[in-house]
């Protein structure tokens, strides 16, 4: 086919087709049918324009090539065949000088006589199907469409064929000749079948036999065959259709399409009530680490050994006491539980050899904290089905909570940089293809921006805790196992570091189903005084357990060290997802990649390097009451990562519902900003669906508050 194209078409046309394919990254050695189609289309555009001029009186005249009057103004401006940038420049220039409406897609020609853009189509299928596809794609009454086929058929907007009979006959004859030449070389069948629909994703597979019969039988009423239905769908114009259908429905259905204007949306109503409280499985910005650098002790890497080594680095332990009680809990039991952990760790140190794992004694305080024997007894349904007043016990509605400032502070802190490196660059083999090289470059730049981020620390902490808890839940089902909360990182100088955040004690864990719950008690170190924001720590009992000497500008200062203790629970499926938290890195990298791709397609080259190395440029990060916040590309990477991490840490049905429902409103607002004149019905119902997800979850309430800021600034 390639040889045929080079013989059959003018070298200038072949060169333009080669350029066009290169611009779109297509290989003409492989896509030979496409190469032929582009050449054919170019030739038809040139033939359409040839010999047509406008004289001094503004009349259209036909002049042969050797005529001395060839200096007359060309009737048609050829846009097809130019590179994209030049083509758009020509289109913009025409629009500015003639007042024509700017088309959404690049047309092929401009007709100075009729003052309209023209889209030329050359099809190997039926002209009406291709015409409908073109019209459906362009969606503009201003652009004139003219379709030619290889069989001599043609179709044009409003049957206005623009050119005289003879000029069109020349084009049809040339197309018929190309078809004959291809057929004589055995190339026509392949060429005919290779035509794709206009900008559609699906291939037009030939459906035969049983599948074809089933397709024809499965159509809506009034359609005799699949092709008719396809043509109808391709040419379907949705405006006014929904209203028409609604009017045919039951009289009880009275949905009216209301125009959605800048004044239409109202802010989302956030609930009133006491401030929301912390509900993550482990402490975030308030966590304190006991650390060892360059660990080389015996048993290094065994969690219990590492934990004991970290505990030995602190010398300020003191008699613990409760500073912030848990309102509903038996606080002395939390205090006794911590004392028990200290005592049993001391027992281990006195032993000759430290064991790999530690099962706690089943004391009354731990049994209470872990809910041992608290579950209601299960009775077989057959034994009680005759009881007349058998019913499920009533459960209280959750109490509404209001947004509190601590969750925004948590998020801001998650976006910040720490002085440690939490992820290493993956060791991946040499790049083979150019695309791999670009992917590696993007990954390396992104990793450099987020490796020090606190959100990345949360990922590694979450992965470790969930992995350890799931392992213990399966390996020691009946035991109250002590699980150290550990993470590993590197200092800026590259030295390895092991960190201890506290401990978890796991309850009984016979987890048969994914949703079966294992209870655990978490005990976490902190320097945060809980009395500063008591509402945040509603679910915790907080002890003061020691004094820590900290270096400051005025020398060493002593600060009280606290232990945040609470009963919590999780399930197999939650732990499984917790172990997968590294996916957050991938999700945010993909979001950054789509930003790079958008920039690259505008500049027509890969912009990865410029994107990350142009430190002066700022990018939108998010909305706040002050307006659109902007920051460096590193800040954008870390903010996107923090959002993804918080979606994982604060995953809940409230978040699922809010994300799904608010997205609908977001799409309508974006359509309004794009001047697409959106319409809605039952907007009140959508607000209701969004607001019923705003109950007490801090992350959902913060997202709703951000959404309101977006609404305010988007509709100015």
Curated annotation (Swiss-Prot):
<keyword id="KW-1048">Host nucleus</keyword>
<dbReference type="GO" id="GO:0003723">
    <property type="term" value="F:RNA binding"/>
</dbReference>
<dbReference type="GO" id="GO:0039523">
    <property type="term" value="P:symbiont-mediated suppression of host mRNA transcription via inhibition of RNA polymerase II activity"/>
</dbReference>
<dbReference type="GO" id="GO:0004519">
    <property type="term" value="F:endonuclease activity"/>
</dbReference>
<dbReference type="GO" id="GO:0046872">
    <property type="term" value="F:metal ion binding"/>
</dbReference>
<feature type="binding site">
    <location>
        <position position="108"/>
    </location>
    <ligand>
        <name>Mn(2+) 2</name>
    </ligand>
</feature>
<protein>
    <recommendedName>
        <fullName>Polymerase acidic protein</fullName>
        <ecNumber>3.1.-.-</ecNumber>
    </recommendedName>
</protein>
<keyword id="KW-0255">Endonuclease</keyword>
<comment type="similarity">
    <text>Belongs to the influenza viruses PA family.</text>
</comment>
<feature type="binding site">
    <location>
        <position position="120"/>
    </location>
    <ligand>
        <name>Mn(2+) 1</name>
    </ligand>
</feature>
<keyword id="KW-1190">Host gene expression shutoff by virus</keyword>
<dbReference type="GO" id="GO:0042025">
    <property type="term" value="C:host cell nucleus"/>
</dbReference>
<keyword id="KW-0479">Metal-binding</keyword>
<keyword id="KW-1035">Host cytoplasm</keyword>
<comment type="function">
    <text>Plays an essential role in viral RNA transcription and replication by forming the heterotrimeric polymerase complex together with PB1 and PB2 subunits. The complex transcribes viral mRNAs by using a unique mechanism called cap-snatching. It consists in the hijacking and cleavage of host capped pre-mRNAs. These short capped RNAs are then used as primers for viral mRNAs. The PB2 subunit is responsible for the binding of the 5' cap of cellular pre-mRNAs which are subsequently cleaved after 10-13 nucleotides by the PA subunit that carries the endonuclease activity.</text>
</comment>
<feature type="short sequence motif" description="Nuclear localization signal 1 (NLS1)">
    <location>
        <begin position="124"/>
        <end position="139"/>
    </location>
</feature>
<dbReference type="GO" id="GO:0030430">
    <property type="term" value="C:host cell cytoplasm"/>
</dbReference>
<keyword id="KW-0945">Host-virus interaction</keyword>
<dbReference type="GO" id="GO:0006351">
    <property type="term" value="P:DNA-templated transcription"/>
</dbReference>
<feature type="binding site">
    <location>
        <position position="80"/>
    </location>
    <ligand>
        <name>Mn(2+) 2</name>
    </ligand>
</feature>
<feature type="short sequence motif" description="Nuclear localization signal 2 (NLS2)">
    <location>
        <begin position="184"/>
        <end position="247"/>
    </location>
</feature>
<keyword id="KW-1262">Eukaryotic host gene expression shutoff by virus</keyword>
<keyword id="KW-1157">Cap snatching</keyword>
<keyword id="KW-0540">Nuclease</keyword>
<dbReference type="GO" id="GO:0075526">
    <property type="term" value="P:cap snatching"/>
</dbReference>
<dbReference type="GO" id="GO:0075523">
    <property type="term" value="P:viral translational frameshifting"/>
</dbReference>
<keyword id="KW-0378">Hydrolase</keyword>
<keyword id="KW-1104">Inhibition of host RNA polymerase II by virus</keyword>
<keyword id="KW-1191">Eukaryotic host transcription shutoff by virus</keyword>
<feature type="binding site">
    <location>
        <position position="108"/>
    </location>
    <ligand>
        <name>Mn(2+) 1</name>
    </ligand>
</feature>
<dbReference type="InterPro" id="IPR001009">
    <property type="entry name" value="PA/PA-X"/>
</dbReference>
<dbReference type="GO" id="GO:0039694">
    <property type="term" value="P:viral RNA genome replication"/>
</dbReference>
<dbReference type="InterPro" id="IPR038372">
    <property type="entry name" value="PA/PA-X_sf"/>
</dbReference>
<comment type="subunit">
    <text>Influenza RNA polymerase is composed of three subunits: PB1, PB2 and PA. Interacts (via C-terminus) with PB1 (via N-terminus).</text>
</comment>
<dbReference type="InterPro" id="IPR037534">
    <property type="entry name" value="INFV_PA"/>
</dbReference>
<feature type="binding site">
    <location>
        <position position="119"/>
    </location>
    <ligand>
        <name>Mn(2+) 1</name>
    </ligand>
</feature>
<dbReference type="Pfam" id="PF00603">
    <property type="entry name" value="Flu_PA"/>
</dbReference>
<keyword id="KW-0597">Phosphoprotein</keyword>
<feature type="binding site">
    <location>
        <position position="41"/>
    </location>
    <ligand>
        <name>Mn(2+) 1</name>
    </ligand>
</feature>
<dbReference type="GO" id="GO:0039657">
    <property type="term" value="P:symbiont-mediated suppression of host gene expression"/>
</dbReference>
<keyword id="KW-0464">Manganese</keyword>
């Amino acid at each position: 086919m390639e040889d045929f194209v080079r013989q059959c078409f003018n070298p200038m046309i072949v060169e333009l087709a080669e350029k066009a394919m290169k611009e779109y990254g297509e290989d003409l050695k492989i896509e030979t049918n496409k190469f032929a189609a582009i050449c054919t289309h170019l030739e038809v555009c040139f033939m359409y324009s040839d010999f047509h001029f406008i004289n001094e009186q503004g009349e259209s005249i036909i002049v042969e090539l050797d005529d001395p009057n060839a200096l007359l103004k060309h009737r048609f401006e050829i846009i097809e065949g130019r590179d994209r940038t030049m083509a758009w420049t020509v289109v913009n220039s025409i629009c500015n000088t003639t007042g024509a409406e700017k088309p959404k897609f690049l047309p092929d020609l401009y007709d100075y006589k009729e003052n309209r853009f023209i889209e030329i189509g050359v099809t190997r299928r039926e002209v009406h199907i291709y015409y409908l596809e073109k019209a459906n794609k362009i969606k503009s009454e201003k652009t004139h469409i003219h379709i030619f086929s290889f069989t001599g058929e043609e179709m044009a907007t409003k049957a206005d064929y623009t050119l005289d009979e003879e000029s069109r006959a020349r084009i049809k004859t040339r197309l018929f000749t190309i078809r004959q030449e291809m057929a004589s070389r055995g190339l026509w069948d392949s060429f005919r079948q290779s035509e794709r629909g206009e900008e559609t994703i699906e291939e037009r597979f030939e459906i035969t036999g049983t599948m074809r019969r089933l397709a024809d039988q499965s159509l809506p009423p009034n359609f005799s065959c699949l092709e008719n239905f396809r043509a109808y769908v391709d040419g379907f114009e949705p405006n006014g259709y929904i209203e028409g259908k609604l009017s045919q429905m039951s009289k009880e259905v009275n949905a009216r399409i209301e125009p959605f204007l800048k004044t239409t949306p109202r802010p989302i109503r956030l609930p009133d009530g006491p401030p929301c409280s912390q509900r993550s499985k482990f402490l975030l910005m308030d966590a304190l680490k006991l650390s060892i650098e360059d660990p080389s002790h015996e048993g290094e890497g065994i969690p219990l050994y590492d934990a004991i080594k970290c505990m030995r680095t602190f010398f300020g332990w003191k008699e613990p006491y409760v500073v912030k009680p848990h309102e509903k809990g038996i606080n002395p039991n939390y205090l006794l539980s911590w004392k028990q952990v200290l005592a049993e760790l001391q027992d281990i140190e006195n032993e000759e050899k430290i064991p790999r794992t530690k099962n706690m004694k089943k004391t009354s305080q731990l049994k209470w904290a872990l809910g041992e024997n608290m579950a209601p007894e299960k009775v077989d349904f057959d034994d009680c089905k005759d009881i007349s007043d058998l019913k499920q016990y009533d459960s209280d509605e959750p109490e509404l909570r209001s947004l509190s400032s601590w969750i925004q502070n948590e998020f801001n802190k998650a976006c910040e940089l720490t002085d440690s490196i939490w992820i290493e660059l993956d060791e991946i083999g040499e790049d083979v293809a150019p695309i791999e090289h670009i992917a590696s470059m993007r990954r390396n730049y992104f990793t450099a921006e987020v490796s020090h981020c606190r959100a990345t620390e949360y990922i590694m902490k979450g992965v470790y805790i969930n992995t350890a808890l799931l392992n213990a839940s399966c390996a020691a089902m009946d035991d109250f196992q002590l699980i150290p909360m550990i993470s590993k990182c590197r200092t800026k100088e590259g030295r390895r570091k092991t960190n201890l955040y506290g401990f978890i004690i796991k309850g009984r864990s016979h987890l048969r189903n994914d949703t079966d719950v294992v209870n655990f008690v978490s005990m976490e170190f902190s320097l945060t005084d809980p009395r500063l924001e008591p509402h945040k720590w509603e679910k915790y009992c907080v002890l003061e357990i020691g004094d820590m000497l900290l270096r400051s500008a005025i020398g060493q200062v002593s600060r009280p060290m606290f232990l945040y203790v609470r009963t919590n629970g999780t399930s197999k499926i939650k732990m499984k997802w917790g172990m997968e938290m590294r996916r957050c890195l991938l999700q945010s990298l993909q979001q950054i990649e789509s930003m790079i791709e958008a920039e690259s397609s505008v500049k027509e080259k890969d912009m990865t390097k410029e994107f990350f190395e142009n430190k002066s440029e700022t990018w939108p990060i998010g909305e706040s009451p002050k307006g659109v916040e902007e920051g460096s590309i590193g800040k954008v990477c870390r903010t996107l990562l923090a959002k993804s991490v918080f979606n994982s840490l604060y995953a809940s049905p409230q978040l699922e519902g809010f994300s799904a429902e608010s997205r609908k409103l977001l799409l309508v607002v974006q359509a309004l900003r794009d001047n697409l004149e959106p319409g809605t019905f039952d907007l009140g119902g959508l607000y209701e669906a969004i607001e019923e997800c705003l109950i007490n979850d801090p992350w959902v309430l913060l997202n709703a508050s951000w959404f309101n800021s977006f609404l305010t600034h988007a509709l100015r």
